[in-house]
């Protein structure tokens, strides 16, 4: 898989050998190792028919959409189902999730919390019986955001899902709002995190709790929308101009983002931006 495939999701590459299965069966195996993912090279012989992950709690007879995934898009699934083969890429493993760095981060800090349930390819597959899993994913993502804030209190984080991800296997983005990254190169990258295409985790949990499923904003038009600053909403003609502006923009975040815990930030940043 190469970055030229132009997908908003990223994954890690190298993989590892043994994991302590006994510890995994006993419960959470939480290692918050301060390591960087070295990237992941997808191996087609890494069984997509693996039984290592959890079985989905519901089947596809409920009308959820199915999608054909290319071989490169299977990498997150392979890691989630057999994380013991990818230890060098994984930051944390539990019975429910794995956490890893995005291979092509779109900000200073950008990690993925990946569900380990079979059959949950994307947000469209989520139903009410998966609510506890969503809460677990959110709690893990929040823990990592707070860890990063402890290291750098100037950062601000947002937790959420792409309405239609490019990589198979349900995953939560934990991404800092500086968007300071050489990997953020085009309109699709920006708009996948800064339009309604990006669904905040807190809203997804509320919708699934109330309606049994999340609202998807997966229209292709959202990824080609006009480039706008996520803080002051000013329009910009291209990514270089936008990124230059974002670096210096000190406007308050939109009020909608400052509500319901959609942003994770330190108290000092609340007083500045709210």
Model-derived features: where do they sit?
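HIT superfamily nucleotide-processing domains
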Residues: 1-274
């Amino acid at each position: 898989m190469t970055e030229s495939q132009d997908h908003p999701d990223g994954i890690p590459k190298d993989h590892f050998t043994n994991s302590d299965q006994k510890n995994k069966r006993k419960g959470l195996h939480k290692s918050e190792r301060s390591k960087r993912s070295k990237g992941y090279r997808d191996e087609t012989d890494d069984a997509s028919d693996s039984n290592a992950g959890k079985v989905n709690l519901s089947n596809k007879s409920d009308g959820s959409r199915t999608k054909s995934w290319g071989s490169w898009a299977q990498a997150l699934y392979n890691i989630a189902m057999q994380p013991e083969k990818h230890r060098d890429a994984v930051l944390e493993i539990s019975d429910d999730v794995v956490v890893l760095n995005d291979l092509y981060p779109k900000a200073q800090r950008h990690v993925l919390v990946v569900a380990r349930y079979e059959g949950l390819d994307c947000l469209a597959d989520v139903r009410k019986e998966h609510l506890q899993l969503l809460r677990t994913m959110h709690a893990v993502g929040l823990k990592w955001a707070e860890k990063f804030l402890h290291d750098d209190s100037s950062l601000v984080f947002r937790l959420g899902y792409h309405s239609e991800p490019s990589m198979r296997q349900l995953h939560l983005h934990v991404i800092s709002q500086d968007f300071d990254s050489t990997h953020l190169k085009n309109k699709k990258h920006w708009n996948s995190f800064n339009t309604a295409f990006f669904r905040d985790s807190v809203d997804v949990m509320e919708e699934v709790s109330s309606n049994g499923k999340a609202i998807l904003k997966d229209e292709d038009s959202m990824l080609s929308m006009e480039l706008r600053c996520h803080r002051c909403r000013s329009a910009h003609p291209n990514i270089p101009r936008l990124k230059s502006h974002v670096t210096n923009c000190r406007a308050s975040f939109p009020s909608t983002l400052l509500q319901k815990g959609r942003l994770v930030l330190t108290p000092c940043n609340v007083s500045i931006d709210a």
